[in-house]
Amino acid sequence: VARNIVGTQSTFFGGVSPLFRGKGHDILGPAVTLQYAPQRPDLMPTGEYAKVGDQNHRIAVNITEEGYVLVVQADGNTRSGVLGGNMLLALQQNRKAAGLVVHGVIRDYAEAATQDFPIWTQDSKTTTDYDSQHDIAPLAVNGRISIAGNTVMPGDWIRADDDGVCFF
């Protein structure tokens, strides 16, 4: 039924699963989208903590309202973690966001494990010791993104549980 609504062959995000299985996280909410792209000096020229208010990943977190799901296109990159950490995840929790879905990995896995926030990712953590955004940069907020071969628009409904993630 869902694929008939959105007009696509599949509404399942293959390869994206709960970061912390067995916690009983079960969410449904509209999407806020965040797109990452390969890093270029002009995308984030002065470092991660410069001009904090202008950074797209922070803007996306700040506009994710109660009940919404932040959906992140990181093109399956497992070398650079996106979001994560106690500050950005705590902000999501305080805003009562429904959850986080990342086609890639988050950063600060150990800190994220201490928070009871629903997260779905491609893998549990980065494949390098350096887990910040060194390969990719946040490019756009609330635009059309692609997750595991599916186009996701802001406002599309996201459903996620221990079995995985789908949209409609």
Where are these regions (language model features)?
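Feature captures the catalytic cores and cofactor-binding loops of soluble hydro-lyases/lyases
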Residues: 1-153, 168
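A hydrophobic, small-residue-rich beta->alpha segment in the mid-to-C-terminal subdomain
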Residues: 157-168
